[in-house]
């Protein structure tokens, strides 16, 4: 992994090294030394022979500090001042709504808030400063790694979606799981993000399919649902999609 989870553990444990700490070498040294001691203890419990050295990490941070320090600033004040001056600010979030640590498909989530509310927190501004929220959604569904994907396509169709859509991890090249369009997920995302507009991408990927299975609801333990249940309500049960096939022939005819 890339250490994202452990970094958040340190943050919420109030023991992480922040970029601003690089201005104070004595504070950085204290935090790094304590962190290395914890890491080595955990490695030992796992039976690993490898260990970390504080001096190595401190040397690396010392070399990075001159390059990073000029960019330290109060992001919230910068954004707020820009808005007060009549400027426009675009906040771009990462990852999908269902990876949100609070509102996603827990425990198959990331460590941060990936919904629109997290943009205000991350930028250091109040939620009323955000006047429009644009949601970006593909014309089909993808997921990286484990976790629920109710509309996951069968192998040949999944591979077709993956190849046509270029669904491979940007960093690792890891193939993404692919499925059909899921309006239940989109509806949920609209609600938890407070979307004011929606942009649907990669419609052309579906051109080669004669029919498209579209999810119209879920079945969970025999009960028909028209919305995405939370993890507690699902209780570990498997969501089964109810699907209708849509013929694309008529959709390809452009009215004159």
Identify the residue ranges that each predicted region occupies.
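Non-transmembrane, aqueous-exposed alpha-helical and coiled segments at domain scale
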Residues: 1-256
């Amino acid at each position: 992994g890339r250490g994202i989870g452990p970094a958040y553990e340190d943050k919420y444990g109030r023991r992480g090294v922040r970029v601003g700490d690089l201005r104070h070498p004595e504070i950085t040294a204290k935090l790094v030394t304590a962190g290395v001691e914890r890491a080595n203890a955990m490695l030992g419990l796992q039976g690993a022979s490898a260990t970390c050295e504080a001096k190595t990490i401190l040397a690396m941070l010392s070399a990075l500090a001159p390059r990073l320090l000029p960019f330290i600033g109060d992001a919230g004040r910068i954004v707020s001042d820009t808005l007060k001056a009549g400027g426009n600010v675009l906040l771009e979030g990462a990852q999908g709504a269902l990876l949100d640590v609070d509102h996603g498909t827990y425990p198959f989530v990331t460590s941060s808030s990936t919904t629109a509310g997290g943009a205000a927190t991350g930028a250091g501004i109040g939620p009323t400063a955000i006047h429009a929220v644009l949601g970006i959604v593909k014309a089909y569904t993808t997921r990286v790694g484990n976790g629920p994907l109710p509309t996951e396509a069968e192998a040949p169709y999944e591979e077709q979606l993956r190849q046509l859509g270029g669904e491979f991890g940007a960093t690792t090249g890891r193939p993404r799981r692919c499925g059909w369009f899921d309006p239940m997920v989109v509806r949920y995302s609209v609600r938890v993000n407070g979307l004011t507009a929606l942009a649907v991408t990669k419609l052309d990927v579906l051109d080669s399919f004669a029919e498209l299975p579209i999810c119209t609801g879920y079945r969970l333990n025999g009960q028909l649902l028209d919305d995405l249940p939370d993890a507690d309500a699902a209780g570990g049960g498997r969501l089964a999609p109810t699907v209708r096939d849509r013929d694309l022939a008529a959709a390809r005819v452009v009215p004159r």
